[in-house]
């Protein structure tokens, strides 16, 4: 047994170190301290928690001596209690594990402790001086145990509930508030439900009340709207108590009470705010921490913000004074009375409004306010003169306004421009060009100055940099900005570095953000790698596979490699299989710590190894990756351990095959006995909530558990339509139809609003349009139901002040066209505009919003065509468009015909790369883009650099297979991994595969790292070559390559090869590929999907049943030491600080 359980057992049996035989037997008549005598009686009664708390209390005030153990055992013997160490240990372990997996029992036993014992338990939670137990030669580090305890679901919940129930009767209020704070801060606020205020004390003295209020303020964002309202009511109930005026003439709200309320001040009513006395609001604004508090009222509404501003105006503070403006926090986002402002104050306000992006909603109003302030700030001055003083309002400047700027103005304002967030891609392109207009070559100084504008620098400019300047950038803190560059820009930087004569000597110095772009071929040439250097690098799997093998030849300490950051991605299954039992168990923690980096195949290998080495201590979640029969072998006694372990993981990434995932979920339901009875079970289930079937959600979650379950369901991102319908049914049962909903209800249900019907959403759109629009703004880029989008569209239309157009253009007269406000609020719901309406949009509106419109995923072909026509109306023919026009189009560019694409100026690879971000091009369009670049740039295929190949993106697939062979091998090999991400036609992939043979040799020479590097290029392999591949390499095909293999080629795989695909690649096999397979091949595929062991695919029949070891003192579930440490932890009642 490991040191953990041994230490715990020694503690529990009073540290008898004599193995069960006593050296001497003291007389039970010898004096035994009453506390130890009480402890011994509790051991006899089976009250082990009470006994341990008494022991802890005794140790705090007495020196532990060796004879005390013998005295206690003598006392037990005198009571005819014949314990042996093994039997007592077994009883103790069973009891501890009962706490671990049934934290309700912990709650019950804590309720049964006497006041002195409960006091001890709370002190263990509070005081660092209780950080260890020192009992002769054994020291128990309670601080380390504290960190482990809360890994067990439900522990925090039990501690939270018992603290509310008993603490305020046993300890002083300040100590109890501190305990609550520790427990709540470790719970993500999920314990705070609206009914919690019924259990909170109503008579706290001032300091305790302030401290507890501070805890609730810290957890504000993690609590529901209903809970926020309930906590606000509890706080104000206490704050109002000493205030006896009842006629309403004087407000109960004082400056100090506003400070105590903190973010809860946004729940004050309009009337209460308007009733605050000028003296008190002035005193509040004068507090040094008032600005910090007002900076955090993210959910304040315009109405309440303007009410506060009005009261401040009535105080001694002048809101037109610069020092006052600096104190207003987020209230500046709703500043009114602009007619009295001068340019200086407008500039000050604009600077303060940088923080307005943190507001929850109302951003359209913020943008309008910034635009008005921008007009005032530039009044009687040119834009060139005021550019540096406009803060982030400059992002509201149109492309024509930016183009009108002088280069000198941009240089002068660069310290402001380089920090602004929210720039559009086209704006960055214009400003970068303006800044570099006077520079012949990009220098280190320029790069230092550009900040966020660096992303607008052309790739050719990076490629033309001096080597020394480039290395100076990469060795400076500026290297962190490399991650903000596009792939084509990153490759331009790398391409320049690799051209140097001593390029390979510097590969190890390439910063983290760029290192993952270094080619496998270039890694082969570098011999100076070590594990320390790689700790800070981000690695592709192909890089990790090569580097792990390379470094494995230079060290005999695998822990050095496994601790080297992302190098764990490269551990092959053969290495895991070859580890000795002892080494594997010693190293498993490295794998577990980096679990998110492991592939499903690696996890499957770990599961098999653990099963063979130590199935009794195997983490139960690994069973889900083994063949399904292993799940059926889990007995009821192991169910809770299985659920806890699996619930901490993401099942969708652990088990990729949907059929097998269904098997796992059925086992979960079986373990739950078809019901989630309470919130403790919700804690246990964890992320598995997202996979429970609709019928279970609708009928299997009890009303008591529903609130906690709903909190968990909020994080589910891939619920099926059936699951969504079940959630909707439960919500309607709980809250009734939307007609009955309050604002708090609607806010709390915001993550689920898209589940409701069009009629139900119509009600929400009418009652709470702002909440609906806020919800939609958080779902940008998500494919949403049409009903939801139409509801958002309706809510915006209802609040729009737009009038019918008087545009004489044919078909536009009388049409209500979109405004910038409308477009901003609608986000993805812009897909609801009629094409005719989009075509009638005002020119200025189109110019200001083209990038936002280009990002809408739901536009139809007709809508895109209308927007393209609008672009031609505004910008003239495509042949007149500049780079910033093209990059701003987004998906609108998809409407360009082949001839229109050929008219574009595509001489810059960055322009081509912006078009390449779209993946819906037809082959003809892609060919036009490719040809246009070659013609406009003057390059031939043989002249292309590696960054050109990256910049083409999916349009590279339009290259003729014969043209591919003209690409320089030195440029091709640098970007093989990037090209391997493209989904090209089979002939094109075959062409790239032929080119790859020049670099990597024929397929029979390919290694695991080469196969990973090739990606989809490997799908260009021939039938004969595929048959010749070693089956051990099959797991190293990328899943995308498996999907790209034509069915007639895929069917050439042998049954052994198919069985060796591994779970990840097997899950990537398409339906059309399956149709080509024989029954024997399909059976092999099923084995791979099920996680069968690849090297025993013929000898390990599907029907064989796994066997478990005989029951021991440490049942299967968690590693023995961990389980007992956690058990000890529960008894010691430690909590994370």
Curated annotation (Swiss-Prot):
Q: Where is the composition biased (Polar residues)?
A: 1095-1115
* UniProt note on tissues of expression: Expressed in the inner ear and vestibule.
> Keywords in UniProt for this one?
Cell membrane, Extracellular matrix, Glycoprotein, GPI-anchor, Hearing, Lipoprotein, Membrane, Secreted, Signal
Tell me how this protein sits in the membrane: Lipid-anchor; GPI-anchor
Superkingdom of this protein's organism? Eukaryota
Q: Which residues form the propeptide?
A: 1114-1137
State the GO CC annotations.
apical plasma membrane; extracellular region; side of membrane
In residue numbers, the region (Disordered) covers: 1095-1119
The cellular location(s) given in this protein's UniProt record come to: Apical cell membrane; Secreted, Extracellular space, Extracellular matrix
- Region forming the signal peptide: 1-23
Residue positions of covalent lipid attachment, annotated as GPI-anchor amidated glycine: 1113
Q: Which residues are glycosylated?
A: 156, 211, 244, 289, 321, 380, 384, 530, 594, 740, 798
- Give the GO biological process terms: cell-matrix adhesion; multicellular organism growth; sensory perception of sound; transmission of nerve impulse
InterPro entries from the UniProt entry: Stereocilin-rel
Its biological function? May act as an adhesion molecule.
Q: Which family does it belong to?
A: Belongs to the stereocilin family.
What protein am I looking at? Answer: Otoancorin
Record the organism. Mus musculus (Mouse)
